[in-house]
Amino acid sequence: MYRAVTRQIEVTVEPNFVPEQSSADRSRYFWSYTIVITNSGEETVQLKTRHWIITDATGRQQEVKGEGVVGEQPTLAPGERFEYTSGVPLSTASGFMTGRYQMVSESGERFEIDVPTFSLDSPDNKRVLN
C-alpha cells in the first residue's frame, strides 16, 4: 500500500494487476487501483478535480485531468473517508502513476493534496520500478 498525507488528508492506494484484462501478446496490461481518502482534519472538504501523470516502462507519459473521481465530487466531513476503484491500461508490463486532487474547504479555500506515486507491476515485469 502507498500512502501520502497533505493537510491532514490521507490518500492511500492499493494497485492490483488484472490478468483477465491483460495480454502480453497484444502489449496490453491492465491494473485496477483502490484509493481511500480520509479527512483527519477539522474542516469539511470537497474533492473537485484530479490530475494524473501515468508513466510506462519506456518513459512515455500520459497526463489525465478531469472533474472529480469516478463521476463524483465527494464531500468529506472531519473523520469521514471516501473509497473508490478505477483502472488503467498500459502497453508495457510496468509503469507508475502519480497525481494530485484539487480540494475546496468549507471556507472556500482551494488547495491540492498529493496522491502517492504508486508502482504498476505485472508478473511479466522483470524489475520493480517503485
Swiss-Prot record:
What residues does the ApaG domain cover? Answer: 3-127
According to its UniProt entry, one GO biological process term is: error-free translesion synthesis
PROSITE patterns the record matches: APAG
Annotated signal sequence range: none
Pfam families from the UniProt entry: DUF525
**UniProt name for this protein:** Protein ApaG
Organism from which the protein derives: Bradyrhizobium diazoefficiens (strain JCM 10833 / BCRC 13528 / IAM 13628 / NBRC 14792 / USDA 110)
